[in-house]
Amino acid sequence: IRYCLLSRGLGDVYKRQYKDYLSFNDFFTRKIEPQNRRIDMNKTSLISPCDARLSMYFIDEKSSFLIKNTRYTLKELLRDGELAKKYEGGYIGIFRLCVDDYHRFHFIDDGIKSHERHINGVFHTVNPIANDVYPIYKENTREYCVHRTENFGDVIVMEVGALLVGRIVNNMEKCRTKKGAEKGYFEYGGSTVVLIFKKNAIIPDEDILVNTVAGYETKVNMGEKIGTSVYIRSVSYTHLTLPTNSR
């Protein structure tokens, strides 16, 4: 804990000092000093929901995406072909969190979120060496909701767990949301957040797309602008449901 905070210059970023954490999980779920994460409140600014390394991809019917060493089509990721079809022509943002990152995630806009859909997978290590040694069922436990936002349309927000994640904790079920408010957190382990946007909803920032095409991730902080809304809202956001949980 001391190494993670002091060697990376994070000692003044969080609310507690390293000696105040009771366990590594306590440290892992730590909160941040609000003044250390500026949230871009411009209505057209798409913000990062978390501190992470970001890759952003265009979605078409042949697309597949590597998430924690597992390749998914959008249909496989959501386990819902009808829902996946609605997002063709849009973008998917994959936010990879490292162990020393702030492991709480936040809402990207005002709106309404649906109930969470939970999909059981088989936990597995994200270590490629272990994957070479053991035949592992490559599917992750994950949860997602549809966030009906004011400025970006219906956005799928997914949290993905791996071997060392005890739980994905979402603070509330269906509720109204405020931009920048905490949505939930990951307990101990490496974790990933995924945002999925419909066609004509956003334009990602150019540097993020250039880095992704070149095979590089872009380091982003929660609240930082990562794109711009081009969404035109034609109906008010009201009722929203999701299929029952897949177990």
Residue ranges and their predicted role:
Residues V146, A201-S236:
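Acidic, glycine-rich catalytic/binding loops that coordinate metals and/or anionic ligands
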Residues S64-Y102, H106-I108, E116-I168:
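Cytosolic, membrane-proximal regulatory domains of ion/volume homeostasis and mechanosensation machinery
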Residues K178-V194, T218-R233:
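Short hydrophobic beta/alpha edge segments that flank linear recognition/processing sites
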Residues R2, R8-L78, A84-K85:
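Extended, compositionally biased flexible segments
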Residues S48-L54, D109-I112, G180, A201-I202, ...:
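Generic structural motif
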Residues P128-V133, V193-E206, S236:
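Short, compositionally biased
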